[in-house]
Amino acid sequence: MKYTLDWLTNPEVFAVNRIAAHSDHRIYANHLEADADNSSLIQNLNGTWKFAWAKNPSEWQQKFYEESDSTDNFDNIQVPGHMELQGYGKPQYVNTIYPWEGQEHLRPPFISEKDNPVGSYVRYFDLNDALKNKRVFISFQGVETAMYVWLNGEFIGYSEDSFTPSEFELTPYIREKGNKLAVAVFKRSSASWLEDQDFWRFSGIFRDVFLYAAPSAHVRDMRVIADYDGTNGIFSATLDIAGKCSVKSILTDENGTVIAESNEKKSVNWTIENSKPWSAEIPNLYTFTVILTDESGNEIEVSRTKVGFRRFELKNGIMCLNGKRIIFKGINRHEFDAKTGRAITKEDMLFDIQFMKKNNINAVRTCHYPNNSLWYQLCDAYGIYLIDETNLETHGTWQKLGATDPSWNVPGSLPEWKEAVLDRAKSMYERDKNHASVLIWSCGNESYCGEDIAAMSEYFRSADQTRLVHYEGVTRVPNHQYDSITDMESRMYAKPQEVEEYLKQNSGRPYISCEYMHAMGNSLGGLSLYTDLEDKYEAYQGGFIWDYIDQAIETKNDDGKTVLAYGGDFEDRPSDYGFCTNGVIYADRTYSPKVQEMKALYSNIRMSIQNGMLTVENRNLFADTNNLSFVVRLEKNGVVLKSDTFSLNVPAGESKTLKLTLHKIDSTGEYVYHVSAVTADQTLWADAGHEIAFAQEVFEVKDNQIPETTLQKPTIVYGDVIIGVHGENFSMMFDKKEGGISSLKYNDFEYITRTPKVSFWRAMTDNDTGASEPYNLAQWYTAGKFAKYKTVSWLEQEDALKITFTYQAACVPTFEFTVTYTAHFDGKLDVCVNYAGVSGMPDMPVLALDFKMKKQLCSFRYYGLGPDENYSDRCKGARLGLWKSTAKENLSGYLNPQECGNRTGVRTLSIHDDMQHGLTFQKASAPFEMSVLPYSAYELENAMHLDELPSVRYTWVRIAAKQMGVGGDDSWGAPVHEEYRIHADQPMKLGFIITPFEA
């Protein structure tokens, strides 16, 4: 058969000579190999390949596949891997528009003739002994976007669909030695119109490539159904076996004990009494093994797959697993590694799944394509629910600048695209159908609607009655025309009140947010407004945060420094720039501060303490708390007085209450009962002692007695410009010209570099920018930064000197505010910022006083909510405690520098250097918010990348009365929720006390 490049622009040609999709069961030559999970029937072709790159087909060396064609002038390339990350072409990030937008005017199914890079891959190999004299197949687990394959000069086949296996038989052309495998990978094809996902546009062979041999008898496919009726497992398997053989099927438990056997060749049916059901909480798995033997009883092939007994269904309009209402505490996960892109490793996947289990995530949506097959095995074993999503997104064909315009949408109801999208659905289904973790099939993402997607839904339902079907795009079509496609109401970025409005209608359908809480930059504020709906509405069944990991690429900047780059940094145009950095973890797989909130609100163990009574509520569906230990501490002002550990078994779905009795409390101070629920023993995903949930009760014992002090009055110098207060081991100077405190010394060490400034501005977050807050709130930028100092007044009291500076804000309408310093004769300094409120101004970002301090004063410890950054709308996961850090460590790793490092509920903050020089800021009446950073808000805002920030010159300490929340409903228009905003007409005071630091 001759190949043609015409296939690249024909949507009706998406596979030539490709074998039928099948289950991803493992095959072995015998049971010993199966037990060791080391198959001689598989020959891995990963590694170094010969490679040549061409900008487009006209420059492509078309005869490279011929045996006589030399590869001496070829380069080397690593497989798996992307061309663009190995020096061929450049990475490009776009979200919804197609990558050729503005370069060429194209419409489906046509592609660029000028910009369609071609990678010519060549691999020479000898056949392993175990594969000789058998039928041999090749499996490409993932290739973007279209591929032609030759072996020893003979055309083998063609395939599209980047994210499911493409397999071909090589038997007629393969030799025992000296094989030349050639693969031409085209970056663009008609399939590119179906793969408009929000990700980097890569190309190449990015998943495993291997040969496998089919012996004289071979299990081509198996369909396993492991149902569960509440007591027993109902097992059935349909086997597709080629060749003459005897068949023995075995089901074994986790201990290897055989619990069922059969000699049926085509189908197996068992009832497993008192089977252990599978769930994310208790992922019980059984092993199904099929042994093929010859007439003499010799093993020909052993096939094996893991199965979990479970029943997922709609009951009275509610999604239920094994009879219980399920809540998805989910996240969207792109496959990504900062060094290798979507060519992720087993180590990446192990980190990811362990992270999810550690941080109470129970579900993943495979946005927006089937993931590496190993991921499903891990989800089965560790316990993660999956929405398995078809590789389909055509966002740019129907939405332009946010407006819905499906005038040239594909696939729509176009017959020429129908078989292509159905093939994608079938390929995903066939590969993943036996995985217990897959609960829902998704027809794709953001592809509008039409008869073609309706056909995908019909296919899933006809092929599989054990799972539900999902597609969010039906919500965008008028008159509910295609609502029948999906079994659930699924929306993206619906506000909490919009979700609640739907739930109040009681439509009879369950609700999920397949995407919510857009975690771009400093985000995830207001997550609790969604999780609170779990208790209010039975039909609310959770959601999937967008998203798991920043898609940022490790590269070198102009100075040779290794940095993480986002869209546009590779001169890629068009680009959506930093919109690819939406992860709860950074691209290097380090945690962002957002994890703290998600972990707390996603926990199935909820605890509360009231008047010393601890209530433990177990919201698990199946698991009790026997696998947990409870650690209780009594703390005073952040210092642990006493701790204890106890066990408490709370059955799933129940609560228990007990009295905490640790210590007699009689002395003055702020006390905290702190209880942690931790893993009692080591698990597959965490060490013993890993915290799952926590609770605190804060209470205060007051002493109304005022301590008597004998003060020696300091020297007060009333100069023409400077008022000085000089006492034992301290000195303060107040500048009537500058308008503030110009010197503060303790033990002759100076702490003031310049007069502290009142600020009403924060470095705008990504969410702020998306909501046009730089425009809406701009007056607050100038209000403080360019405020005019007006007057000063002072009053000498019995034990202090009070000095008040009055300023006029640089905005319209203008207003006055004051800063009062009260210099106590014992060396304490009270500071009070007084804001009376003003009408006619927009909401205020923050009310704060900024201290520009010496850079060596970069270590800090505080007693407040922590340990990680938190805000008024993102503090449910923070706890009161005594924490320490540095200014550098406190700079969050958001790739676009922005507001970060804030803490709420702060009682005391101490800043110090290595020599123990320092200051302590103590609350006056109410706790304050604060941050300690190496940069000012204005320096952060002026940089577009972390490596653009200047060399560190100072430590910036911000003490704030209040800062508005960070939001997160979306990053393109949703403001911070009303309850977390600061209204300009609201009077506010910021008060705190400065004293010298004591180590």
Predicted feature locations:
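Accessory beta-strand-rich segments of carbohydrate-active enzymes
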Residues: 1-15, 35-36, 50-54, 74, ...
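Extended substrate-binding grooves/exosites of carbohydrate-active enzymes
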Residues: 1-37, 193, 299-613, 620-626, ...
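Accessory carbohydrate-binding/adhesion or oligomerization-edge regions at the termini
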Residues: 1-101, 180, 184, 531, ...
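An acidic-aromatic loop/edge-strand motif
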Residues: 3, 82-85, 90-92, 96-111, ...
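Beta-strand/loop-rich accessory regions of lumenal/periplasmic or secreted enzymes
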Residues: 84-86, 92-94, 142, 187, ...
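Beta-strand-rich binding/interaction modules
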Residues: 149-151, 233-262, 288, 613-646, ...
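Extended acidic/polar, glycine-enriched regions
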Residues: 174-178, 240-315, 666, 671-712
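Catalytic cores of secreted or luminal carbohydrate-active enzymes
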Residues: 195-218, 551, 560-615, 619-639, ...
